[in-house]
Curated annotation (Swiss-Prot):
Pfam families for the chain: RadC (PF04002), UPF0758_N (PF20582)
Record flagged with keyword Protease: yes
UniProt name for this protein: UPF0758 protein lwe1562
Classification of source organism: Bacteria, Bacillati, Bacillota, Bacilli, Bacillales
InterPro entries given in the database record: MPN, RadC_JAB, RuvA_2-like, UPF0758, UPF0758_CS, UPF0758_N
Listed transmembrane segments: none
Residue stretches making up the MPN domain: 102-224
Domain of life: Bacteria
Length: 224
């Protein structure tokens, strides 16, 4: 069934115009992005297949162009459109979330990073950079892969902190298992970051481990 054969009330574009963007399902949003179906399938059928490929819609932001192309009906053009839309949304989210946000407690910081880190399949080491008022001035993923002291080097973290004229930093990484209990390597990395920060004069306010909808603050738990 082609898009032209879908009833007016079911077409994503018409639904958006009549009821607003919030009324659209995730599949309908994807359908608007990829625009067309194939000879044998409607755009909504293909869009729904994309959504079903991922356990959580947030996982789409980490998919490669090749992964999208594994979906029947998706070629390089459609895959590129999806990735461009996701990247634009990510950039808008980062800028919006950083504007005049003050970190007063671990919860404030976790609200910024939980949507990005909670559902990843690999460990990501992420940093928030703060000014003297504890306002977020920048944030970035520094390392991807298993967290250990040989990979997460304080030099890389504090080089960026100095470049951004940071007064303090907060570090985060996710545990793909969903269990945020710190490992011995997590504690060793934290110890090295604290020591380096003390020498440079940039405080490590916290190192937070993100699990599935839960977290552990190493500072609150007294690990440093």
């Amino acid at each position: 069934m082609l898009t032209s054969e879908i009833s007016e009330s079911e077409k994503p574009r018409e639904k958006l115009q009549n009821y607003g963007i919030e009324a659209l399902s995730s599949s309908e949003l994807v359908a608007l992005i990829i625009e067309t179906g194939t000879k044998n399938e409607s755009v909504l059928t293909i869009a729904n297949r994309i959504i079903m490929k991922f356990k959580h819609v947030a996982e789409m932001q980490y998919a490669s162009i090749e992964e999208f192309q594994l979906v029947n009906g998706i070629g390089v053009a459609k895959a590129s459109k999806i990735m461009a839309a996701i990247e634009l949304g990510r950039r808008i989210s980062i800028v919006t979330n950083q504007e005049e946000i003050v970190i007063r407690c671990p919860d404030d910081a976790v609200k910024l990073v939980m949507p990005e880190l909670a559902f990843l399949f690999q460990e990501h080491f992420h940093c928030i950079f703060l000014n003297t008022k504890n306002q977020v001035i920048y944030r970035q993923t520094i390392f991807v892969g298993g967290l250990n002291a040989s990979i997460v080097h304080p030099r890389e973290v504090f080089r960026l902190a100095l470049r951004k004229s940071s007064a303090a930093i907060m570090c985060f990484h996710n545990h793909p298992s969903g269990d945020p209990t710190p490992s011995s390597e997590d504690l060793l990395v934290t110890k090295r970051l604290v020591e380096a920060g003390n020498i440079i004069g940039i405080t490590l306010l916290d190192h937070i481990i993100i699990g599935k909808n839960k977290y552990i603050s190493l500072k609150e738990k007294g690990y440093f």
